[in-house]
Amino acid sequence: MTTPSPTPPLAAAEVAAAAGLQQRDLLAVLDRVGLEPAVAFLVHDLTARCDTPDNPDAARIGLAVEHSGHRTERVLAVRKGEPVRVDEETAGPPPVRLTFDLADLVRGVYGPPPGPGAGLFRVERDDAWFVKNADDAEPFRIFESYMRAVDVLVRAATSRPGDLGRLAARHASDKWGLWHWFTPLYEHHFARLRHQPVRVLELGIGGYQNPDEGGGSLKMWRSYFPQGRIFGVDYFPKHGLDEDRIHTLQGSQDDAGFLRRVAEEHGPFDIVIDDGSHVAGHQQTAFRTLFPAVRNGGFYVIEDLWTAYCPGYGGAATARAEGRTSIGLLKSLLDDLHYEEWTAPEPAAPGFAAPSLVGVHVYRNLAVLEKGRNSEGTIPFFAPREIDYV
């Protein structure tokens, strides 16, 4: 027996069809239908399209929706092997809340997939709750369960296929869900390489001193690139994670000699990802040493740009990141990208990366650098260098 939608059929159909309208027309439809009826219909359809959850610990996630100064919320119960449903039994606020604008949620559920960098919701997380409810033996288990639960809801709420996000959740990689939201961006840049025999090097494996712990991202990349070879570097030995297409290496990302040996033995690489110590000086050393080891057409990625604002990582407690940090490096790379356009009478020498840097893509806490031949030549000399009519 089919459970009827809690919204009148005509209104429900109108909301679904409105996803393809211009913004002002969509808002007019939502004003006419009303927040509560629209959300009732959306939640009905959203929970019905959710994949079967596989999070080991039961999760309660708030879904808040706002429209025209009004707000409503449902708490969704996400339990392993069960359909996602509205939780009307458990008291207390959920430890994770996703807040959508009503129009964005309508487009997410019924429209085409959004762009990779589209921020469609706000995330609120009660970190104290996770600390209080953590298992001493497995302190991150419940957090990882929530990462998987969030992945199920976000994919249903944004029409994203989310293959890499699903792999991140399966392997407990922090690149998607609660920690970061990187996987749509990675898919955007890496999709053309997916079925090639790529060589991927990631700095930072995770799991701290335990030789058998961590490696979630390495396993995610192994699954995403079926012909790829995945190399991981960590300060601690991680040989317990080695398998057919995953090879771990022990060393410091601040040791240029070690990194050169890695590049000589295992490079050149299609992709290098710096998810290591996040210390400013270490990031600079890794970039200087490993960017040359990326082939033309490949990518160099720096994660966790937030540490540029943290003194404990070599950053500064300021609103403007300094030159020695990852953000400072990216600012200088924008100048280097345009080195052929410099007009100073005696310009300084461009950075070493300038002739082979063809793209700088910066997102929240993530930078993707494209390697290639940056020698297009300057704008023609007869193009005006000044404007005399303003």
UniProtKB/Swiss-Prot annotation:
Needed co-factor(s): Mg(2+)
EC number: 2.1.1.306
GO terms under biological process: antibiotic biosynthetic process; methylation
Pathway named in the protein's UniProt entry: Antibiotic biosynthesis
Residues the record lists as binding Mg(2+): 275, 303-304
Residues engaged in binding S-adenosyl-L-methionine: 202-208, 217, 234, 252-253, 275
Gene Ontology molecular functions: metal ion binding; methyltransferase activity
SUPFAM superfamilies with a match to the protein in the record: S-adenosyl-L-methionine-dependent methyltransferases (SSF53335)
Catalytically driven reaction(s): 8-demethyl-8-(2-O-methyl-alpha-L-rhamnosyl)-tetracenomycin C + S-adenosyl-L-methionine = 8-demethyl-8-(2,3-di-O-methyl-alpha-L-rhamnosyl)-tetracenomycin C + S-adenosyl-L-homocysteine + H(+)
Keywords recorded for this protein, A-Z: Antibiotic biosynthesis, Magnesium, Metal-binding, Methyltransferase, S-adenosyl-L-methionine, Transferase
Active site, renumbered: 278
Group of enzyme by EC: transferase
Family classification: Belongs to the methyltransferase OleY/MycE family.
Function text: O-methyltransferase involved in the biosynthesis of the permethylated L-rhamnose moiety of elloramycin, an antitumor polyketide. Mediates the methylation of the hydroxy groups at the 3'-position after the sugar moiety has been attached to the aglycon.
The name this protein goes by in its record: 8-demethyl-8-(2-methoxy-alpha-L-rhamnosyl)-tetracenomycin-C 3'-O-methyltransferase
Protein source organism: Streptomyces olivaceus
Upper taxonomic lineage: Bacteria, Bacillati, Actinomycetota, Actinomycetes, Kitasatosporales
